Each structure stands twice: as C-alpha cells, then as structure tokens.
Curated annotation (Swiss-Prot):
PROSITE patterns: MRAY_1, MRAY_2. Catalyzes the initial step of the lipid cycle reactions in the biosynthesis of the cell wall peptidoglycan: transfers peptidoglycan precursor phospho-MurNAc-pentapeptide from UDP-MurNAc-pentapeptide onto the lipid carrier undecaprenyl phosphate, yielding undecaprenyl-pyrophosphoryl-MurNAc-pentapeptide, known as lipid I. It catalyses: UDP-N-acetyl-alpha-D-muramoyl-L-alanyl-gamma-D-glutamyl-meso-2,6-diaminopimeloyl-D-alanyl-D-alanine + di-trans,octa-cis-undecaprenyl phosphate = di-trans,octa-cis-undecaprenyl diphospho-N-acetyl-alpha-D-muramoyl-L-alanyl-D-glutamyl-meso-2,6-diaminopimeloyl-D-alanyl-D-alanine + UMP. This is Phospho-N-acetylmuramoyl-pentapeptide-transferase. The chain crosses the membrane at residues 26-46, 73-93, 98-118, 134-154, 166-186, 197-217, 234-254, 261-281, 286-306, 338-358. It is found in: Cell inner membrane. HAMAP family: MraY. Pathway: Cell wall biogenesis; peptidoglycan biosynthesis. PANTHER family: PHOSPHO-N-ACETYLMURAMOYL-PENTAPEPTIDE-TRANSFERASE, PHOSPHO-N-ACETYLMURAMOYL-PENTAPEPTIDE-TRANSFERASE HOMOLOG. The lineage of its organism: Bacteria, Pseudomonadati, Thermodesulfobacteriota, Desulfobacteria, Desulfobacterales. It comes from Desulforapulum autotrophicum (strain ATCC 43914 / DSM 3382 / VKM B-1955 / HRM2). It is a multi-pass membrane protein. The gene is mraY.
Amino acid sequence: MLFHYLYPLHTEISFFNLFRYITFRTIYGGLTAFLICFLLGPWVINRLSRMQIGQFIQNDGPETHFEKEGTPTMGGILILFSLGVSTLLWADLTNHYILITLLSMLLFGAIGFIDDYLMQVKKRNMGFTARGKFLVQIMAGLVISYLVYLCPDFDTSLSIPFLKNFTPDLGIWYIPFATLVIVGTSNAVNLTDGLDGLAIGPIIIAGVTYMIFAYVASHITIASYLQVKHIASCGEITIVCGILAGAGLGFLWFNAHPAQVFMGDTGSIPLGAILGTIAVITKQEILLLVVGGLFVIEALSVIIQVGYFKLSKGKRVFRMAPLHHHFELKGWPESKVIVRFWIIAITLALISLSTLKIR
C-alpha cells in the first residue's frame, strides 16, 4: 500500500525513491511487524485472559507442564494480524505471489482458529477430528497449489540441492506435490509447538533463510551467478519473509520461557502453511527438508512412535512424542531443550544456505 501511494511521489521528493527497493521495504516491513506485536501484545494477552481462553494441559504430559495450565492461548491472532497488516503496508499488492501467500495465511489461519475455538470456547477437548482437520487442510492446500500453478512465470520443475543439472518436471503433478509440502509443513510446525518459544524460534530462522533465497532468485545477476532459477516476481516474497521474522520476534518477546501467551493452532497451522507456500514459490521446496529440518524431526518422531506402538502392540521408541517431550522426561530443563533445538535449527539453516555455492 505504501509502495503504491508513496513511490509515485519520488519524482517530486527523492526520498520516496527508497520504496522501490525490496531491501528497504523488507527491513521496515519486519520492524513494523515487530512493533505491532510488541505494542499490541499486552492488550491481546489481557483480552485472552479475560475471555478465559487458557491452555489445557493433558494429564499424560510432563509434570512441569501443569504450571502452564490457564496460560492464554490463541496468541497466533497477534502474529497473523501483524503479518497481514505489515504485508498490506509494505508489499506490492499487485504481485500474484503476495496475494497467494496472504490467501494461504487466511485459509490455514481460519482452520487453526476454528480448531482452537472448538477447544477453548466450545470446550471440545480435541477441537477438529484429526481426519476432518486433515481433509480441510488438503482442500486449502490444493487451492493454494493450483493458484501457484496458474502463475504465468511459475515452473513446475524441481530444484534438487547439490544436483544443478537434475530438474525433473512434474507438470500437473506439481499440484499434489505442492499440497503435500504445504500441508506437511503446517502439521509439522503444529507438532513442534509444545514448549515456550520452541516453534517460533525456528520459524524466525526459516523466515530469514527463505528471505535470502527469495532475494537471490529474484535478482537476475545473482541468480545467474549462483545458478539458481530466476523468478523475477518472487522478489516481493523477500518482504513477506522479513515480515514473518519480525512478527516472530515480536511474539517471542511474550512467548519466551516462561511464556505469557501461546500461539495455539491459530498460529502454528498457518505459519507452517506460509512457510510451505514460500518454499514452493521460491522453488526451494526440497530444501525445506533441511531449512525446516527441526520440524521434520519432530513430525517423524510422532510417526515413528505411533507406528512402532501399533506394530509392537504397546511398546514405545521414545518416552513421549513429539521428540522435545522425550528429552524433558529424560530430565532436561525446558529452557535447555528449547535453546538446543534452536541451535539445531540455526545449523540446518546454515547448511541450507551453503547449497547456494555447492551445486
């Protein structure tokens, strides 16, 4: 919005020429998102507390979690609001990738909100049924994937890390593949969101990482030098990534241990979907397995635990899944689990960035 209204004034006032630069709008978009979260956070937390929308702790969880009972949840509203407003202010709203990313946030945000609403307000213990939620996510993912597929400059070939000459073209089959990426990431982030700041930290890290990927892909000279597929229109996604990181930092101010608020499904489900959508748009969908490796590990721990439990008729691989609970039950303090998982996320992000040179 600011781009559309202020940039045309650059012929009269040279300062407004800054608004044509993606780097400028990325930095100030991120700062705007941070400030919105930081300033509105206390009001949102107080409002959620007054509405008695508090976290429910299951009896089979770690004992240290019982003190979290009643902590305001559905704080994802704060993240999505700051993300949406900042994107509307700083991004080019005529860019189709921006509109698709915003739609992804709205669709999956609605799914997460309804799930939280059923649990917290209507007091349905588990919200959506697992099958029902997955079906709705698939439908939303198909819509987003189809819209990306229709974009005139979008390529349905895959970018395989370390194999620059191997780019299989999926054609129409890219739609179900992209749906799998978006829905899978959405659920993986949701599973990771079990400790104070555990999910939002890696989201910030992934946002910064994809900010670099998006900028590289949109810059024809850099993309050519690094042998990365050039996608001119995805430059605006750089701004969304910066805003995602800024909103995440603003939320982390209140979500850091001991948390004053939890994001709930209202935050984790759409944030994962946004990350998956960005990975698809920037043609770094395979590399998301590395960038979001922590989310992958957490999701795999649940799959392994459930599968082994059924096959072995009651035996477990981990003391509890997702994996972060396993380490808690081994005696690790919550803060140690969180920071060590963040370190893993940073390491994986650095490895993924190295693929820009190792091709």
